[in-house]
Amino acid sequence: MGFRKLLVAFVKPTCGLRVFLFMAELFETNSEPPVYRVIPVLELAEDPLDPVIQPSGSTLKSVANPLVLIRPCVRIIFSIGEWLFGFAVLMIGLSVLAAMPVLQFLSLGYLLEAGGRVARTGRLRDGFIGVRLAARLGGLVLGCWLILLPLRLVSDLAYSAQIIDPGGRTAAAWRIGLFVLMGLSGLHVGMACARGGRLRYFLWPFNFIWVIRRLLRGGYYSEARDIVWDTARSLRLPYYFSLGLRGFLGAFAWLVLPVTLLALGRLPAPLAPLVGLLGGLLLALVLIYLPCLQMRLAMKNRLSAVFEFREARRNFQRAPWAFAVAFVATLLFALPLYLLKIEFVPREAAWLPSLVFITFIFPARLFTGWSLGLAIHRAVPRHWFFRWTGRLPFVPVAGLYVLIVFFTQYTSWNGVWSLYEQHAFLVPVPFFGM
């Protein structure tokens, strides 16, 4: 209250009242009662009440909800696991496609698109295309495979019972149980796919309840149709096939003459060694420029880009050492597959060498795309010192690769035809070899 009195003491009356600070006497100059101007006064509030203070003997503690901290960590772990699973599924899928005639171009097209996208954006993470979608499709396939395991077991038991006691009651019971399990398994797979096809839906036995409720709301058919159609379009199969075919034709156009001359060097003719040597020199020269040219085709999405020789030289001048690293990685990662071609691989296991091919070539494509993107985003060439020193790894690495390729015709199962199996730029198993 003392503060309020002090505040009023500073206010001057509107008529006839003088206030002397710090004095109690008021001297009136007019007999009329003084009129004071009313001003708002902010009362000092007491200190806000503290939170409820627990008794000293209380054992309660204010602890944050642990779920708030656990849930983000769990989501991050599941997201990383889903990405890794999708990447593994993607590699296996590309390996299977690479071992199949004609469909090989889908695998090659994906590898070129991955490198081309990195070249356009300059970011390596953009080369991992469709990993989440691959995880979704891989979960669907894995769920169907898990559901079919009991069915295969019962089928084997029914077959064994039929062999032991043909026409007996035990064999008939197993056969009836097999048909019942087939119906239930098919129904469960259908309900899991109708709900979304995630892996967890295959492990949940009551999907039919959700499907019935969704059907009662209406519009399920049109929604499911649109989702399936959008998923099929997102795969971009015609685009990958077209890009892979054009990448194959462009690379083969550069390789066919040097490889043919190298193969002719094996003939029993006087000039055959010279022809083979000329083919080896031309092949080494082509190998120096072909990774950049083929990646330019993927980046520009046109076949004529694979013949833009001068543009490839300009790109090299802007990022010489990046191209050198990508070139060494491309040829070095292509060597392991030659070891797998020494022995004939059965058709059923043809995807295993393809898996080795995809595992090694995919990083090489990403590095080549990254080097091209680095060159595109630079306006001026690098210093002459880096340009000339960046050329040093090309000649010895290309010469060593040509030497290894020349001797593969004596170790490979396909003989001289193995010279045309340039899987560093073509498909892992050539189309004519199937």
Specify the residue positions occupied by each region the protein language model found:
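Short polybasic linear motifs
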Residues: L6-V11
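Helix-coil boundary and N-terminal low-complexity module in membrane systems
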Residues: A24-P291, R296-I342, F362-M434
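Charged, glycine-enriched surface loops/patches
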Residues: L340-W351
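Short alpha-helical packing/oligomerization segments
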Residues: A349-F362
